[in-house]
Amino acid sequence: MASGGHGQEAEKLRIIISPAKKMVVDTDTFACKEVPCFMEKTQILKDWICGLSYAEQKALWKCNDKIAQQNAERFAQMDLYRNLTPAILAYDGIQYTYMAPAVFEDGQYAYVQDHLRILSAFYGVVKPMEGVVPYRLEMQAKAAVNGCRNLYEFWGEDLYREVMKGDDIDENRDDSRDDSRVLINLASKEYSKCIEKYLRPGDRFITCIFGELENGKVVQKGVYAKMARGQMVRYMASINARQPEQIQGFDRDGYAFDPDRSSEKEYCFIR
């Protein structure tokens, strides 16, 4: 398998992950000094959701009454700039539990802040230490906002452009040079396609597959894949990964890199 993307700067490597539906509030661990960059669009979404009837909100969220009522109250009382929780602590799903950011060391926080980007239907792109409030909105939700047919159209190329931003990531760069931008994809298809659709020739987009062999085929199971994605973020932060090839050493929970089933676009880890 050929290797590539051997640039020197850490900022060239980006990791994308999905958000989690379940969110918590933690205003004590870290003070939030910044908010995500697309707050104007977030405000548009908030206003649109608040303008829906309760029945419409519940249909949008595809949930039971208890969860719908909780989120209707959240949106009615929502202040996007107060009582903020760092995003990496706010999302409370399986991959975040296994990432275990609450016990990161200082260097690991700095690493994820530089490299990790959380894709969100509500905020667009979120850096780990940016402050967010609990919300419920999935990218595939049927939300026709601002004349757009859905949220993929609403966000357009914004997520790609923001993920690719960095001191050494220049959208006008010469894509023929061997210093391509590298994205490690740990997101679900629902979110990764917000980026994939806009990839340029010089971009290197590597999806990590975490699976088990069943009858000679790689089978990826949802819960276990989420666990492994979280552990991969933690692993990358612990080794200060700067090149994609470094993540091939990932060995948590019995996984091992399988070069025969991997390619330039997919890194396959089997256990």
Question: What are the residue ranges of the model-derived segments?
Answer:
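N-terminal amphipathic/basic-hydrophobic helices that include classical n-h-c signal peptides
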Residues: 1-10
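Extreme N-terminal starter segment of soluble prokaryotic enzymes
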Residues: 11-15
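Active-site helix-to-loop segments that bind/position phosphate- or nucleotide-bearing substrates
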Residues: 16-103
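Internal, well-folded beta-alpha domain core
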Residues: 101-263, 268-271
